[in-house]
Amino acid sequence: MNKELPLLQALIDYHKEENTIFSMPGNKCGLAFSRDEIGNYLRENLGNLDITEVDPLDNLHHPEGVIKESKELLAKYYGVKKAYFLVNGSSSGNLSSIFSAFNEGDEVLVERNCHKSVYNGLILRKLKVRYIEPVVYGGGGLFLPPDKNNIYSAIEKCDNPKGIILTYPNYFGISYDIEEIIEDLKKRGLKVIIDEAHGAHYGACKSLPKNIAPLADYTVVSAHKTLPALTGGAYLLVNDDNENLDFYISAFMTTSPSYLIMASLDYSRYYLSKYGKEDYRSLIQIAEKEKKRINELGKVRVLSKEELPEGYDIDLSRYVLVLPKGYSGGKLQDYLRSKKIQCEMSFFSGVVLILSPANVQDGMDKLYQALDDLDMDLLKDEEKSIEFNCIIPEKKMEAYEVFKNNGIWVNLNEAIGRIVKEAIVPYPPGIPLVSSGEKITQEIIEEIRGYLNEGISVLGVRDEEILVVN
């Protein structure tokens, strides 16, 4: 190993392993650019095309030429009034949307398992937060998005809600039919922000869930997660007319935007409009065929829509491999990694794979062979029997108020009755057990110890201590 270039050398070594990439980025380490001649040119000339704001290439912060044209094509494809390129990922889009849609002190509904950047935006904008409970699915650490009842139940508990932030779909590729809900919420005067980070490809063909960007006020889309875009490339799709939005986008984005990322975003929209329907239809046909073969092995099963409650849909271009009780998703991920198959993530009872038209056929053959060869004894984890619960503790302070105070680390035994400063998040499943500003109870301490005793990582816990407001 070249010790003078540790990161670069690690990337080179990983590339030489020739792994099958069933994780982000959506360009699958460049393979997705090989769809046509111009995509190949982009892939092979990344160094040559790394340019800045010279005269013919426009300016992302004040687009008047080719970037303006690209944004107009993007808005037309997704069916929205305005569209923006984001080079700082969806995080900058979430922050810009929150600051544009809401004012300090506004009451806003959010899913408890929303993205970290949404939490950051709520704190920075000094908003009053009302949580929507996630839906526990089975006992394996798999959660569903909130359904209609969860959403309206949360609204009824609000005093004067100004808006709502929903995730569509979640990390598992699962979504709830929220079209009518969005229309109703907008009639009530609520601003609607959709974090569609994992759904950039939605609507490309009829077998995929719908593109709901035309309905929402703001939709944030991570092109780099599923499309042939470079990491950090995302879209913000807008139907709201707030004149301050452009300022917030510039404020939360670098003044030196990467033209490589922007070019890949332009290519991703072009790819969807020209090849999306054909390629995703073919991908899903292959994925459905291979799903039957994998399920017939009797070792893992690919989660299907038929297993989910009414009203839920699942992305057929994403595999959620679920193990029987007593087997470890983390160990399955490690096993597949040893077979040069890169998963997106593991959860308590399985793994998530993000498929792509770029590598689906060869990748599926490799995946099937690895699962066929799998000795299930390698994945046994019978000692772990934790039950995943959804507890929403009493809120004593708004999250933004917490950061006006100093914190102190205290032992779990001494934390009952204290107000949490740093959120406590078991991973998996990645949903905050206690958020900033909430009160610790005996029940919560028992939940934390349950996760720790099972060997599950709990973010916000350090040597059995947590950070509370001093």
Protein language model regions, located:
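N-terminal "arm"/small-domain region of PLP-dependent enzymes with the aminotransferase-like
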Residues: 1-65, 190
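Conserved PLP-enzyme active-site core in the AAT-like
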Residues: 7-10, 20, 80, 90-303, ...
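Conserved N-terminal alpha-helix of the aminotransferase class I/II PLP-enzyme fold
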Residues: 47-90
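Short glycine-rich or small-residue beta-strand-to-loop segments that form or flank ligand, phosphate
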Residues: 57, 84-86, 164-167, 352-356
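Structural signal for conserved beta-strand scaffold positions within catalytic alpha/beta enzyme cores
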Residues: 85, 131-133, 220-221, 345, ...
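Conserved C-terminal alpha-helix-loop-beta "cap" of PLP-dependent enzymes
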Residues: 295-461
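Terminal helix/beta-alpha structural elements that buttress the NAD(P)+-binding lobe
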Residues: 461-469
